[in-house]
Amino acid sequence: ISSDYNYTIFVFLNTKTTLPIMKHLPLLLLLGGLLSASAARSADPVRYVDAATLTVIGKALSTEQPYNRIDTTRFRVPAKTPGYCYHPTGLAVVFRTDSRTIRARWETSGKNPSDNMAAVAQKGLDLYIRSNGEWVFAGVGRPKINGKNDRHDAAIISNMAEGEKECLLYLPLYDQLKKLEIGVDEKSVIAPMENPFRHKIVVHGSSITHGIAAGRAGMAYSSRLGRDTGLYCINLGFSGQCTMQPEFASYLSRVEADAFVFDCFSNPSAEVINERFDAFVDTIRRTHPTTPLIFLQTIRRETRNFSTRIEKFEREKQAAAEAQVRDRMKTDKNIYFVDPGDLLGSDHIATADGTHPTDLGFTYMLDRIEPQIRKILGKYGIR
């Protein structure tokens, strides 16, 4: 019997039916009792706590607002990117609780879902609970996508077994998060938890890194890489805006990181790659002289399959990327180029729109890049 609804049973008696019904009265009373218990469970009181009082992970540097990725009052960013800095992409709340139920109330902007994204990824929440040392999917906070689209209230999971749980709640991929409250059983305990990930790997890139077309908020490849490896992966993906700008290079140079992974060849043209690559690396190297810098070759976009214009643009871009990185590798032994071939496979089913990987696309991508990234990081004791 669902615990989300209340039920009322009406029994109408008359002289012709009274006796047959009376024969089944015990069964009716039992059914009524079960439904009453269900109604009582659905009305169990919930206590909400401000998620900002728990542990928020996933930021490269601290911010005044709890769910922003970059504090734009302190750091200059490229002109078109401040709004993306307010997206809590890759951020998560980690906490312990013995509650059998987890709910959430949260507030986003009122913008409509994008045409190539799932609303539950763009505006929703994605919960994982640790089981036998692994982060296991537990449920989602489904956003409201009618009306103003800005205030949401959802049951993420209920009827869990008793006992303490370690929880990892990913925040929306592609919308501003203004407020978040986590609801637990009134008499249960909920408390901050230490960051469960180790080291610090900053992943900077395009909409592919941002997670456009991922199925849930925790399914961008950097988040999956973190859960797979236990490494603390920071998502600094900015949809359409990663072209090795000096503002981003300056910001990254201030971040203490054990390694950087770059998806920085997806947005710029070959000309921009040739113009900006060396200056971008030079800025980061001033404060990170020996930190491993891992550059990913951009994906092969399906949009080039029949367009001669896109084919030419993409081919030239990929050639420029490889040439620039390999030339720099001649004088810098801590720079790496990861090009495992066709990142998204050859079956034409791994993107939402010819460019942005779906969960399947990210699986193909990780199958190819994760072993190489692990091998590189292992040289530096990053495991």
Regions inferred by a protein language model and the residue ranges of each:
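Oxyanion-hole/transition-state-stabilizing segment in secreted/luminal serine hydrolases
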Residues: 213, 225, 242-287, 298-305
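Short helix-loop-beta junction
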Residues: 222-235, 326
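Substrate-gating cap/lid alpha-helix
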Residues: 301-339, 364, 383
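Catalytic nucleophile-elbow at a beta strand-turn-alpha helix junction centered on a G-D-S/GDSL motif
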Residues: 198-219
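Histidine-centered active-site loop/cap adjacent to the catalytic His
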Residues: 352-383
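Bacterial N-terminal signal peptides
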Residues: 26-36
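N-terminal secretory targeting modules
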Residues: 1-22, 37-200, 374-383
